[in-house]
């Protein structure tokens, strides 16, 4: 991909919506796969009362729409302004008591885990037709749309997996039976293995579609056994990718 094409795909623009200022991709098709669309607002005529506490709206009690769910509430039930990066808002926006905690938890992904994914980690990567694994660095592209795998020159060299084409993710753990399987219709209730409990993430299997090919392609990432910090970095990257997969499926289910 030429630098000119890449720049055009990564271009962004500032837009003003009823909810606030948003920095969105110039071309909608090139948006982050983790993003959410703005919800339609419940029409004013359909909500004469707060949808949380049932207080009637009047001249003194104004109605406000939650920017995340689009429902209308009184100021007491929708007075928190919280960052909502999945909708590309520039500033914190008004959210209801139910949505605000969700957005705060997602902020941890953008503040901590996304940085891990962008930095990358070293894995033993096994492709479905490979006889032996290749040592490769796996990282998320800056536009969040691709997983980039770069080898040491002895194997396939460079591979790209489009995040939006990932169909299933299976976490490989040690300390408990085989890990959770994520799919478009089934999400695990457990936390990522590296974030708590006795299990520890040691790898991940990805299944994804490839343009022009039938069925699913599969690859497996496994953290190496070396004693230095690269294994720790790899397990942290796996936990971050586990969270990213959950956000990906939520975006699809919107």
Swiss-Prot record:
Alphabetical keyword list: Cell junction, Cytoplasmic vesicle, Endosome, Metal-binding, Zinc, Zinc-finger
Binding site for Zn(2+) 2: 66, 69, 96, 99
Localisation per UniProt entry: Cell junction, Focal adhesion; Cytoplasmic vesicle; Endosome
Stored Pfam families: FYVE (PF01363), ZFYVE21_C (PF16696)
InterPro entries: FYVE-type_Zinc_Finger, ZFYVE21_C, ZFYVE21_C_sf, Znf_FYVE, Znf_FYVE-rel, Znf_FYVE_PHD, Znf_RING/FYVE/PHD
Residues that, per the record, bind Zn(2+) 1: 50, 53, 74, 77
Keyword field contains Chaperone: no
Superkingdom field: Eukaryota
Keyword Ligase included in the entry's annotation: no
UniProt-annotated stretches for the region PH-like: 107-254
Major location category of this protein: other
Subunit structure: Interacts with PTK2/FAK1.
Descriptive protein name: Zinc finger FYVE domain-containing protein 21
